[in-house]
Amino acid sequence: MGASLKDIACKLNLSKTTVSWVLSGQGDKKGISAETQSRVLACARSLAYEPNLLARSLNTGVSKTIGLILPSISDTFFAHIADRIESEAEREGYSLMIAGSNSETERENALIRLFRSKKVDGIIIAPADASGREVGRLAESGCPVVLFDRGLAKTDAGCVVIDNEAGSHALVRHLAARGFRKIAIITTFPHLPTMELRHRGYLRALAKAGLHADPRLYGEVAYAGYRQHVCDTLDRILATVPDTDGFFFTTHILATEAPVSYTHLTLPTT
């Protein structure tokens, strides 16, 4: 076990309070001499002292830790974002606690409560709960919250998102402009605002092109076991509407599964 504040204080014949102030960076503010501060720091190094971060956060109200909640840690999209967030956090002197919600509301809410109990200084989250109740309570409590990828209409938290409706509208309009007329949509988590907006963009693009939104060309995939579900959904659509000539996937995870089982098909990819 490493040395404690008491060990350092006894060795230097100082009070624990003085040692604590120096090690927490408050030496100058508390009027402690430069010589005493140097002695404390040197002693801490020689005794391999490691601060109790939880105790420090309780005393100062600052943990220098940010909680990050992702829908999926294994998803390359979110993994890349986590990597960039961690780099920026480290640049500012913060460490990151990362957890995955599996896009499950109950798990997400439990993680929010867990991070709060760990006294994190803020939480960054791609929310799974479309109601935003727990995130809303978090924001109201005064804890800094930033949403990304998925916004919540009833929450005042800061949010970083793209224009999902405009993006999907442009993509489907591009397919229609190339002459494709029976464009299917494959989606997941339809309750999420992000997916609702992408579906809305799809429907708007079809209407703009004078195309009928055929319900047979709609596929909804459960995330659990999505690999098989994507193939089953494609089978069902192609069996029902054999002349389907285009597919719009609302997320890259679904899109990357299609070529695996359908390399023999000639379908638009741009």
Residue ranges and their predicted role:
Residues 1-4, 45-77, 81-83, 91-94, ...:
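N-terminal helix-turn-helix/winged-helix DNA-binding helices
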Residues 1-62:
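N-terminal helix-turn-helix DNA-binding module of bacterial transcription factors
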Residues 18-21, 59-72, 183-189:
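Short beta-strand segments enriched in small/hydrophobic residues
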Residues 46, 87-92, 116, 139-147, ...:
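Bacterial carbohydrate/catabolite-sensing allosteric modules
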Residues 69, 99, 125-126, 186, ...:
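Structural motif
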Residues 98-101, 124-127, 142-152:
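Short beta-strand elements of ligand-binding domains
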Residues 102-105, 126-131, 252-254:
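Short beta->alpha connector loops
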Residues 122-123, 246:
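Short, Asp-centered acidic motifs that coordinate Mg2+ and/or phosphate
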